[in-house]
């Protein structure tokens, strides 16, 4: 469950390390984002020679949350940390590698690229 001011780690090699949610996209008064939702983020910490610089604003898709996601069979998949993958204006990933597992809920037309790059799909 991600809301405004939430900090997330970045699960791709775009150059950003930590980002902060500045808006949950998808509705005028939408408060929370879960796995698979697109948010607007600001880069708070970045590595020296990466594509993303501190202060840059990007779209991002949430790939892991502490809250987790409930499956139809009743099981819940939770993670230790909140994480997102940075996206460009066309909602394509900026990085070329994805770190850590992602969930099956990302297997939509939009985010198949992220699923194919991920080392593990839960």
Curated annotation (Swiss-Prot):
InterPro entries: Ribosomal_uL14, Ribosomal_uL14_bac-type, Ribosomal_uL14_CS, Ribosomal_uL14_sf. GO terms for biological process: translation. PROSITE patterns: RIBOSOMAL_L14 (PS00049). One of its GO terms (molecular function) is large ribosomal subunit rRNA binding. Transmembrane segments: none annotated. Pfam families: Ribosomal_L14. SUPFAM superfamilies: Ribosomal protein L14. One of its GO terms (cellular component) is cytosolic large ribosomal subunit. Gene3D superfamilies: Ribosomal protein L14 (2.40.150.20). Keywords: Ribonucleoprotein, Ribosomal protein, RNA-binding, rRNA-binding. Belongs to the universal ribosomal protein uL14 family. Part of the 50S ribosomal subunit. Forms a cluster with proteins L3 and L19. In the 70S ribosome, L14 and L19 interact and together make contacts with the 16S rRNA in bridges B5 and B8. Binds to 23S rRNA. Forms part of two intersubunit bridges in the 70S ribosome. PANTHER family: 50S/60S RIBOSOMAL PROTEIN L14/L23, LARGE RIBOSOMAL SUBUNIT PROTEIN UL14M. This is Large ribosomal subunit protein uL14. It comes from Shewanella loihica (strain ATCC BAA-1088 / PV-4).
